[in-house]
Amino acid sequence: QSMSTLHQEEAFEKADQLSLKKTLEETEAFHKKLNEDHLLHAPEPVIKPGTAYKNQVPINVQAHPGKYIIESRYGVHTLEINDDTRFHSGASTLPPSXYASRFEIHFQPEIQXYRNGVPIDAEXXGAPAIPKYNDYIIITXKQPAVDGGSPILGYFIDVGIGXPSRVSEPVAALDPAEKARLKSRPSAPXTGQIIVTEEEPSEEAGTENXQRVNTELPVKXSNNAGVXEPEETGGAEITGYYVNYREVIDGVPGRXREANIKAISDEAYKXEEXTIAVPGPPHMTFKNRARVVGGLPDVVTIQEGKLLASDEHXNLKYGSEISDFTVSVFIPEEEARSVA
Protein backbone atom coordinates (compact mmCIF):
# COMPACT_ATOMS: atom_id res chain seq x y z
CA GLN A 1 0.00 0.00 0.00
CA SER A 2 2.86 2.38 0.80
CA MET A 3 4.44 1.66 -2.59
CA SER A 4 1.13 2.36 -4.31
CA THR A 5 0.81 5.68 -2.47
CA LEU A 6 4.37 6.58 -3.43
CA HIS A 7 3.67 5.82 -7.09
CA GLN A 8 0.52 7.94 -6.95
CA GLU A 9 2.42 10.87 -5.46
CA GLU A 10 5.10 10.56 -8.14
CA ALA A 11 2.41 10.42 -10.83
CA PHE A 12 0.68 13.51 -9.41
CA GLU A 13 4.01 15.36 -9.19
CA LYS A 14 4.88 14.45 -12.76
CA ALA A 15 1.43 15.53 -13.93
CA ASP A 16 1.86 18.86 -12.13
CA GLN A 17 5.25 19.35 -13.79
CA LEU A 18 3.82 18.59 -17.22
CA SER A 19 0.92 20.94 -16.60
CA LEU A 20 3.27 23.70 -15.46
CA LYS A 21 5.54 23.13 -18.48
CA LYS A 22 2.57 23.30 -20.83
CA THR A 23 1.38 26.52 -19.19
CA LEU A 24 4.82 28.08 -19.54
CA GLU A 25 5.04 27.06 -23.22
CA GLU A 26 1.59 28.50 -23.93
CA THR A 27 2.48 31.73 -22.12
CA GLU A 28 5.75 32.02 -24.05
CA ALA A 29 3.97 31.40 -27.37
CA PHE A 30 1.33 34.00 -26.46
CA HIS A 31 3.93 36.65 -25.64
CA LYS A 32 5.88 35.82 -28.80
CA LYS A 33 2.77 36.27 -30.93
CA LEU A 34 1.95 39.43 -29.03
CA ASN A 35 5.43 40.79 -29.77
CA GLU A 36 5.10 39.95 -33.49
CA ASP A 37 1.73 41.68 -33.58
CA HIS A 38 3.37 44.68 -31.90
CA LEU A 39 6.01 44.87 -34.65
CA LEU A 40 3.46 44.71 -37.47
CA HIS A 41 1.62 47.81 -36.33
CA ALA A 42 2.68 51.33 -35.62
CA PRO A 43 2.63 52.23 -31.93
CA GLU A 44 -0.62 53.86 -30.88
CA PRO A 45 -1.14 55.86 -27.69
CA VAL A 46 -3.73 54.26 -25.43
CA ILE A 47 -5.75 55.98 -22.71
CA LYS A 48 -6.89 53.69 -19.92
CA PRO A 49 -9.98 54.69 -17.93
CA GLY A 50 -9.20 55.58 -14.36
CA THR A 51 -12.46 54.35 -12.77
CA ALA A 52 -15.35 52.16 -13.92
CA TYR A 53 -18.89 53.09 -12.90
CA LYS A 54 -22.09 51.08 -12.43
CA ASN A 55 -25.34 53.02 -11.97
CA GLN A 56 -23.27 56.19 -11.47
CA VAL A 57 -21.42 54.52 -8.56
CA PRO A 58 -17.67 53.80 -8.75
CA ILE A 59 -16.89 50.08 -8.83
CA ASN A 60 -14.46 48.82 -6.19
CA VAL A 61 -12.85 45.65 -7.55
CA GLN A 62 -11.02 44.91 -4.28
CA ALA A 63 -14.24 45.06 -2.25
CA HIS A 64 -15.89 42.42 -4.45
CA PRO A 65 -13.19 40.02 -5.61
CA GLY A 66 -14.22 37.85 -8.53
CA LYS A 67 -17.41 39.78 -9.25
CA TYR A 68 -15.95 42.55 -11.38
CA ILE A 69 -13.21 42.01 -14.00
CA ILE A 70 -11.84 45.05 -15.80
CA GLU A 71 -9.48 44.50 -18.74
CA SER A 72 -7.84 46.81 -21.25
CA ARG A 73 -6.22 45.25 -24.32
CA TYR A 74 -5.41 46.69 -27.73
CA GLY A 75 -7.20 49.92 -26.88
CA VAL A 76 -10.45 48.09 -26.02
CA HIS A 77 -11.66 48.37 -22.42
CA THR A 78 -14.14 45.79 -21.06
CA LEU A 79 -15.99 45.41 -17.77
CA GLU A 80 -17.20 41.90 -16.91
CA ILE A 81 -19.73 41.39 -14.08
CA ASN A 82 -20.21 37.87 -12.68
CA ASP A 83 -23.56 37.39 -10.89
CA ASP A 84 -23.06 34.41 -8.57
CA THR A 85 -25.61 34.34 -5.74
CA ARG A 86 -25.64 30.62 -5.02
CA PHE A 87 -23.68 29.15 -2.13
CA HIS A 88 -22.51 25.56 -2.13
CA SER A 89 -19.38 23.64 -1.38
CA GLY A 90 -18.67 22.61 -4.94
CA ALA A 91 -17.02 24.80 -7.50
CA SER A 92 -19.36 26.39 -10.00
CA THR A 93 -18.63 28.32 -13.16
CA LEU A 94 -21.43 30.58 -14.32
CA PRO A 95 -21.47 32.61 -17.50
CA PRO A 96 -21.48 36.37 -16.99
CA SER A 97 -24.91 37.90 -17.03
CA UNK A 98 -23.93 41.30 -18.44
CA TYR A 99 -21.10 42.96 -20.28
CA ALA A 100 -20.33 46.59 -20.55
CA SER A 101 -20.58 48.03 -24.03
CA ARG A 102 -17.34 47.92 -26.04
CA PHE A 103 -15.82 51.28 -26.75
CA GLU A 104 -12.63 52.61 -28.30
CA ILE A 105 -10.81 55.91 -27.97
CA HIS A 106 -9.19 57.51 -31.01
CA PHE A 107 -7.21 60.70 -30.70
CA GLN A 108 -4.32 62.50 -32.37
CA PRO A 109 -1.52 63.33 -29.92
CA GLU A 110 -0.04 66.81 -30.10
CA ILE A 111 3.76 67.02 -30.22
CA GLN A 112 5.38 70.25 -29.10
CA UNK A 113 9.16 70.86 -29.03
CA TYR A 114 10.76 73.22 -26.50
CA ARG A 115 14.18 74.82 -26.25
CA ASN A 116 15.16 76.45 -22.97
CA GLY A 117 11.55 76.34 -21.87
CA VAL A 118 10.29 78.23 -24.93
CA PRO A 119 8.06 76.46 -27.50
CA ILE A 120 9.49 76.43 -31.02
CA ASP A 121 8.14 75.38 -34.41
CA ALA A 122 9.45 72.14 -35.92
CA GLU A 123 10.80 72.14 -39.47
CA UNK A 124 9.00 68.83 -40.18
CA UNK A 125 5.78 67.63 -38.59
CA GLY A 126 6.47 65.40 -35.63
CA ALA A 127 10.23 66.10 -35.63
CA PRO A 128 12.22 68.19 -33.15
CA ALA A 129 13.19 71.67 -34.26
CA ILE A 130 16.87 72.26 -35.05
CA PRO A 131 18.85 75.28 -36.19
CA LYS A 132 19.85 75.46 -39.85
CA TYR A 133 23.25 74.29 -41.08
CA ASN A 134 23.74 71.91 -38.18
CA ASP A 135 25.84 68.74 -38.36
CA TYR A 136 22.74 66.62 -38.99
CA ILE A 137 19.55 66.82 -41.07
CA ILE A 138 15.97 65.54 -40.77
CA ILE A 139 14.70 63.24 -43.53
CA THR A 140 10.96 62.65 -43.87
CA UNK A 141 9.62 59.56 -45.73
CA LYS A 142 6.29 59.43 -47.58
CA GLN A 143 4.22 56.27 -47.77
CA PRO A 144 3.98 54.89 -51.34
CA ALA A 145 0.63 55.21 -53.07
CA VAL A 146 0.46 51.49 -53.96
CA ASP A 147 1.83 49.02 -51.46
CA GLY A 148 -0.08 45.88 -52.41
CA GLY A 149 -1.91 45.84 -49.10
CA SER A 150 1.14 44.67 -47.17
CA PRO A 151 2.08 46.51 -43.97
CA ILE A 152 5.08 48.85 -44.27
CA LEU A 153 7.57 48.04 -41.52
CA GLY A 154 10.12 50.76 -42.29
CA TYR A 155 12.18 52.59 -44.87
CA PHE A 156 15.75 52.30 -46.18
CA ILE A 157 17.61 55.57 -46.85
CA ASP A 158 20.58 55.59 -49.26
CA VAL A 159 23.32 58.14 -48.58
CA GLY A 160 26.34 58.95 -50.75
CA ILE A 161 29.16 61.47 -50.83
CA GLY A 162 30.61 63.20 -53.89
CA UNK A 163 34.20 63.34 -55.15
CA PRO A 164 35.73 61.42 -52.23
CA SER A 165 39.25 62.51 -51.34
CA ARG A 166 39.84 59.84 -48.68
CA VAL A 167 39.83 56.78 -50.91
CA SER A 168 40.95 54.59 -48.01
CA GLU A 169 37.70 55.05 -46.12
CA PRO A 170 35.04 52.39 -46.82
CA VAL A 171 32.26 54.99 -46.99
CA ALA A 172 33.95 56.61 -49.98
CA ALA A 173 33.83 53.42 -52.06
CA LEU A 174 30.94 54.27 -54.40
CA ASP A 175 29.83 52.40 -57.52
CA PRO A 176 30.19 54.12 -60.94
CA ALA A 177 26.47 54.87 -61.18
CA GLU A 178 26.54 56.64 -57.80
CA LYS A 179 29.60 58.67 -58.80
CA ALA A 180 27.99 59.71 -62.10
CA ARG A 181 24.84 60.79 -60.30
CA LEU A 182 26.76 62.82 -57.74
CA LYS A 183 28.94 64.48 -60.41
CA SER A 184 25.80 65.79 -62.13
CA ARG A 185 24.94 67.92 -59.11
CA PRO A 186 25.31 71.71 -59.47
CA SER A 187 28.54 73.23 -58.20
CA ALA A 188 28.84 75.76 -55.41
CA PRO A 189 31.04 78.87 -55.70
CA UNK A 190 34.74 78.72 -54.71
CA THR A 191 35.14 79.79 -51.13
CA GLY A 192 38.85 79.45 -50.40
CA GLN A 193 42.40 79.55 -51.70
CA ILE A 194 45.56 77.46 -51.69
CA ILE A 195 48.95 79.19 -51.90
CA VAL A 196 52.21 77.30 -52.51
CA THR A 197 55.52 78.75 -51.28
CA GLU A 198 59.02 77.48 -50.50
CA GLU A 199 58.97 78.92 -46.98
CA GLU A 200 56.59 78.87 -44.08
CA PRO A 201 54.40 81.98 -44.46
CA SER A 202 55.18 84.49 -41.74
CA GLU A 203 51.75 86.10 -41.96
CA GLU A 204 48.24 84.94 -42.56
CA ALA A 205 47.81 82.91 -45.72
CA GLY A 206 46.58 84.98 -48.66
CA THR A 207 47.19 85.75 -52.33
CA GLU A 208 50.17 87.99 -51.49
CA ASN A 209 52.16 85.00 -50.22
CA UNK A 210 52.36 83.57 -53.74
CA GLN A 211 54.59 86.49 -54.80
CA ARG A 212 56.99 86.09 -51.86
CA VAL A 213 59.06 83.08 -52.97
CA ASN A 214 62.73 82.62 -52.16
CA THR A 215 64.47 81.99 -55.52
CA GLU A 216 67.96 81.58 -54.05
CA LEU A 217 67.31 78.24 -52.44
CA PRO A 218 67.82 75.02 -54.42
CA VAL A 219 64.86 72.99 -55.52
CA LYS A 220 63.39 71.02 -52.64
CA UNK A 221 61.37 67.83 -52.68
CA SER A 222 58.52 69.52 -50.86
CA ASN A 223 56.22 72.53 -51.03
CA ASN A 224 54.28 74.40 -48.39
CA ALA A 225 50.57 74.68 -49.14
CA GLY A 226 49.04 77.63 -47.31
CA VAL A 227 45.28 77.41 -46.73
CA UNK A 228 42.93 80.38 -46.33
CA GLU A 229 39.72 79.62 -44.45
CA PRO A 230 36.59 79.75 -46.66
CA GLU A 231 34.41 82.77 -46.15
CA GLU A 232 31.14 80.87 -46.66
CA THR A 233 30.78 77.60 -44.83
CA GLY A 234 27.01 77.41 -44.47
CA GLY A 235 27.32 77.91 -40.73
CA ALA A 236 29.31 74.70 -40.22
CA GLU A 237 32.50 74.72 -38.17
CA ILE A 238 35.65 73.74 -40.07
CA THR A 239 37.75 71.25 -38.11
CA GLY A 240 40.54 70.61 -40.63
CA TYR A 241 41.67 70.27 -44.23
CA TYR A 242 42.70 67.47 -46.60
CA VAL A 243 45.27 68.34 -49.28
CA ASN A 244 45.59 66.30 -52.49
CA TYR A 245 47.89 67.06 -55.42
CA ARG A 246 48.64 65.71 -58.89
CA GLU A 247 51.64 66.30 -61.17
CA VAL A 248 51.13 66.96 -64.88
CA ILE A 249 54.30 66.54 -67.01
CA ASP A 250 54.22 67.42 -70.72
CA GLY A 251 50.46 67.35 -70.69
CA VAL A 252 50.29 63.86 -69.16
CA PRO A 253 48.61 63.89 -65.74
CA GLY A 254 50.11 61.71 -63.06
CA ARG A 255 48.33 59.90 -60.31
CA UNK A 256 46.66 61.90 -57.56
CA ARG A 257 48.48 61.79 -54.24
CA GLU A 258 47.25 62.39 -50.73
CA ALA A 259 49.38 64.94 -48.97
CA ASN A 260 47.85 64.14 -45.59
CA ILE A 261 45.73 61.28 -44.30
CA LYS A 262 44.56 63.00 -41.13
CA ALA A 263 42.86 66.38 -41.30
CA ILE A 264 45.23 69.26 -40.51
CA SER A 265 44.14 72.49 -38.87
CA ASP A 266 47.27 74.60 -39.49
CA GLU A 267 47.32 77.52 -41.92
CA ALA A 268 50.08 75.83 -43.96
CA TYR A 269 50.91 72.21 -44.69
CA LYS A 270 54.21 70.82 -46.02
CA UNK A 271 53.56 68.57 -49.04
CA GLU A 272 56.40 66.05 -49.25
CA GLU A 273 57.85 64.96 -52.62
CA UNK A 274 55.81 67.57 -54.44
CA THR A 275 58.58 68.44 -56.98
CA ILE A 276 60.50 66.25 -59.41
CA ALA A 277 63.88 66.87 -61.10
CA VAL A 278 62.96 66.34 -64.76
CA PRO A 279 63.26 68.72 -67.73
CA GLY A 280 60.27 70.82 -68.64
CA PRO A 281 57.86 72.88 -66.55
CA PRO A 282 55.86 70.45 -64.39
CA HIS A 283 52.36 71.60 -63.52
CA MET A 284 51.07 70.75 -60.09
CA THR A 285 47.35 70.72 -59.35
CA PHE A 286 46.34 71.06 -55.72
CA LYS A 287 42.93 70.25 -54.31
CA ASN A 288 41.90 71.14 -50.79
CA ARG A 289 38.83 69.83 -48.98
CA ALA A 290 37.58 71.30 -45.74
CA ARG A 291 36.29 68.92 -43.08
CA VAL A 292 33.35 70.17 -41.00
CA VAL A 293 31.91 68.80 -37.78
CA GLY A 294 29.43 66.71 -39.77
CA GLY A 295 32.19 64.94 -41.75
CA LEU A 296 33.50 65.45 -45.25
CA PRO A 297 31.49 67.89 -47.41
CA ASP A 298 29.46 66.42 -50.25
CA VAL A 299 29.27 69.46 -52.56
CA VAL A 300 32.32 70.03 -54.79
CA THR A 301 33.29 73.61 -55.52
CA ILE A 302 34.26 74.96 -58.91
CA GLN A 303 37.90 75.33 -59.99
CA GLU A 304 38.99 78.94 -60.06
CA GLY A 305 42.22 80.98 -60.17
CA LYS A 306 45.88 80.34 -60.98
CA LEU A 307 48.93 80.74 -58.76
CA LEU A 308 52.64 80.54 -59.64
CA ALA A 309 55.54 79.44 -57.44
CA SER A 310 59.05 79.61 -59.00
CA ASP A 311 62.17 77.72 -57.91
CA GLU A 312 65.82 77.87 -58.99
CA HIS A 313 68.25 74.99 -59.24
CA UNK A 314 71.98 75.05 -60.01
CA ASN A 315 71.54 73.08 -63.24
CA LEU A 316 67.79 73.42 -63.89
CA LYS A 317 65.39 76.34 -63.95
CA TYR A 318 61.67 76.04 -64.34
CA GLY A 319 58.44 77.32 -62.82
CA SER A 320 55.88 75.27 -60.94
CA GLU A 321 52.49 76.54 -62.02
CA ILE A 322 49.48 75.86 -59.85
CA SER A 323 46.92 75.43 -62.61
CA ASP A 324 43.84 75.33 -60.42
CA PHE A 325 42.63 74.73 -56.90
CA THR A 326 39.40 73.69 -55.25
CA VAL A 327 38.06 74.09 -51.75
CA SER A 328 35.02 72.11 -50.70
CA VAL A 329 32.79 73.28 -47.87
CA PHE A 330 29.50 72.07 -46.46
CA ILE A 331 26.68 73.78 -48.35
CA PRO A 332 23.09 72.44 -48.36
CA GLU A 333 21.92 71.09 -51.70
CA GLU A 334 19.08 73.61 -51.93
CA GLU A 335 21.47 76.56 -51.69
CA ALA A 336 23.84 74.93 -54.18
CA ARG A 337 21.03 74.83 -56.74
CA SER A 338 20.10 78.47 -56.13
CA VAL A 339 23.72 79.63 -56.47
CA ALA A 340 24.59 77.59 -59.55
From Swiss-Prot:
GO molecular function: protein homodimerization activity
UniProt keywords, alphabetically: Cytoplasm, Muscle protein
Superkingdom as given in the UniProt entry: Eukaryota
Tissue specificity note: Seems to be expressed in all cardiac and skeletal fibers.
Skewed-composition ranges (Acidic residues): 197-206
Compartment annotation: Cytoplasm, Myofibril, Sarcomere, M line
GO cellular component, one term: M band
Stretches for region Disordered: 177-212
Cited function: Major component of the vertebrate myofibrillar M band. Binds myosin, titin, and light meromyosin. This binding is dose dependent.
Known partners and oligomeric status: Homodimer. Interacts with TTN/titin and PNKD.
Protein's UniProt name: Myomesin-1
Chain's gene name: MYOM1
